[in-house]
Amino acid sequence: SNRPMPLNIKQFNNMIQCTVPARSWWDFADYGCYCGSGSGSPVDDLDRCCQVHDNCYNAGGGVTGCAPKSKTYTYECSQGTLTCSGENSACAATVCDCDRLAAICFAGAPYNDNNYNIDLKSRCQ
């Protein structure tokens, strides 16, 4: 689809590019059971990173009225290190941290090409 991405998703993609420069964010958009969807059991560590990220978003950090998918925030990327700005609102700070921790998690998890674009119906019940 050519719909523009929500700004926050774009920011998350930029964070991933910061910690995993060798891969496209697209590699993470449809991986395992949780990177791009969300059901069943995670297939590996990278998929687990996405499950944790989903749970982080769903919790909204406990901030009332916080909508993580559309919330933008301020952060910096310096030589692969992500820092969320102290100027962020409570909601933005929470979402920034969800994304920051996931991007760091992605960098530390092995990428298994066999888990890209898997059959969700058979593998993610």
From Swiss-Prot:
EC number, as in UniProt: 3.1.1.4
Principal subcellular localization: secreted
Reaction catalyzed: a 1,2-diacyl-sn-glycero-3-phosphocholine + H2O = a 1-acyl-sn-glycero-3-phosphocholine + a fatty acid + H(+)
Manner of cofactor binding, per the entry note: Binds 1 Ca(2+) ion.
CC annotations in GO: extracellular region
Tissue: Expressed by the venom gland.
Superkingdom of source: Eukaryota
Binding site for Zn(2+): D30
Annotated catalytic residues: H53, D99
Keywords: Calcium, Disulfide bond, Hydrolase, Lipid degradation, Lipid metabolism, Metal-binding, Secreted, Signal, Zinc
Signal peptide per UniProt: 1
Compartment list: Secreted
Protein's recorded name: Acidic phospholipase A2 6
Organism (species): Naja sagittifera (Andaman cobra)
Native organism taxonomy: Eukaryota, Metazoa, Chordata, Craniata, Vertebrata
